[in-house]
């Protein structure tokens, strides 16, 4: 193999090295919050909503002792927020942060830091913007319509490689067929497998994946691979200096667990706007009369409404999809 050949890799391998290899983007001390805001960072209302969801799951399981497994935990911000929100609630929360980076200093000692979900958990497994960072290969249809792997250099240049084959070809044909020359897709099979593996660790409860996503009929014609650095969208270059991400085919992830691609008794796919609305986060403004009877309370409520509006906004975080999989004791490990 020549040095020139070694420079070119499929996007899955290149992303793995850039994000999680030595000196990789996600292993840096500043963590994801140093480069972009997720719903977790946008407002404590998000952690409050997850805390209410955790309470619902505990009630369904008939227990006050419940597991909360945060997959792709970043630096533990969501877990810290949920633990704070459940203080004094009577819930005994066993918190697990699943993350490939090292445990950050100062994290609540109640949080167990691990690189894989604990098996046999009973409670809520929550994965916010995790699946979009599971590395995947990119395919593009050549001039004859043949789907080929896209290879990338360390500088971000691309070329077409071998035809897509095997399980990847089957996934494309089922979930994201490429018919026109130049059409592109991210091959989501590794994400399906990652999600199914995470769900399989639950003995009972709910697994929830939250991400920017698409479903059959709304796939982007040229894929969605991009980069983020210091709060700005940048070209996807696998050099470790930026996040590399693409939207998730969440309907395929749903089917990987044996559920319907949307809906059904054990699987549900809804927008974040709808999911948070059910949990009391709506973005409605407080009544103006409150300003005269309780000015400080009105200001607080107005601020909270603004944060809720960001979490549920059309064209923004509110359009994220929530995939929920319910796991009964008979289904678990």
Listing of model-derived features with the role each one plays in the protein:
Residues 69, 98, 125-128, 210:
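Active-site flanking residues adjacent to catalytic metal/cofactor-binding acidic residues
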Residues 169-333:
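Long, Lys/Arg- and hydrophobic-enriched amphipathic alpha-helices
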Residues 1-116, 121, 139, 274, ...:
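Rossmann-like AdoMet
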Residues 11-17, 127, 214-218:
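Hydrophobic/aromatic-rich, well-ordered segments within soluble, folded domains that form packed cores
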Residues 73-78, 132, 214-215:
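Gly/Ser/Thr-rich loops at beta-strand to alpha-helix junctions
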Residues 124-176, 222-230:
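A mobile, often basic/glycine-rich helix-loop segment
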């Amino acid at each position: 193999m020549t040095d020139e050949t070694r420079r070119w890799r499929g996007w899955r391998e290149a992303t793995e090295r850039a994000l999680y290899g030595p000196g990789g983007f996600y292993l840096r001390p500043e963590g994801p919050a140093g480069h972009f805001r997720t719903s977790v960072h946008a407002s404590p209302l998000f952690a409050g909503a997850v805390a209410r969801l955790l309470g619902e799951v505990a009630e369904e399981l008939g227990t006050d002792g419940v597991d909360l497994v945060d997959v792709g935990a970043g630096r533990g911000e969501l877990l810290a927020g949920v633990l704070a929100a459940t203080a004094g609630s009577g819930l005994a929360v066993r918190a697990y942060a699943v993350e490939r980076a090292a445990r950050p200093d100062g994290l609540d000692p109640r949080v167990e830091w691990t690189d894989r979900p604990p098996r046999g958990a009973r409670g809520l497994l929550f994965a916010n913007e995790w699946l979009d960072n599971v590395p995947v290969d990119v395919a593009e249809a050549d001039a004859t319509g043949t789907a080929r792997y896209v290879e990338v250099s360390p500088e971000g240049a691309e070329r077409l490689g071998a035809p897509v084959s095997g399980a990847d070809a089957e996934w494309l044909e089922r979930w994201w067929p490429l018919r026109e020359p130049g059409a592109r897709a991210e091959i989501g099979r590794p994400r399906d497998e990652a999600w199914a593996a995470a769900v399989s660790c639950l003995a009972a409860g709910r697994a929830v994946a939250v991400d920017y996503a698409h479903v059959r009929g709304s796939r982007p014609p040229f894929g969605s691979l991009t980069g983020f650095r210091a709060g700005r969208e940048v070209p996807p270059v696998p050099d470790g200096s930026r996040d590399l991400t693409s939207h998730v085919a969440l309907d395929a992830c749903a089917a990987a667990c044996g559920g319907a691609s949307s809906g059904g008794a054990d699987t549900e796919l809804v927008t974040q706007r709808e999911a948070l609305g059910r949990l009391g986060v709506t973005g409605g403004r407080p009544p103006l009369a409150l300003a005269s009877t309780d000015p400080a309370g009105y200001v607080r409520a107005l601020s909270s409404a603004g944060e809720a509006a960001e979490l549920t906004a059309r064209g923004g975080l509110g359009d994220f999809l929530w995939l929920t999989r319910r796991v009964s004791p008979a289904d678990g490990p």
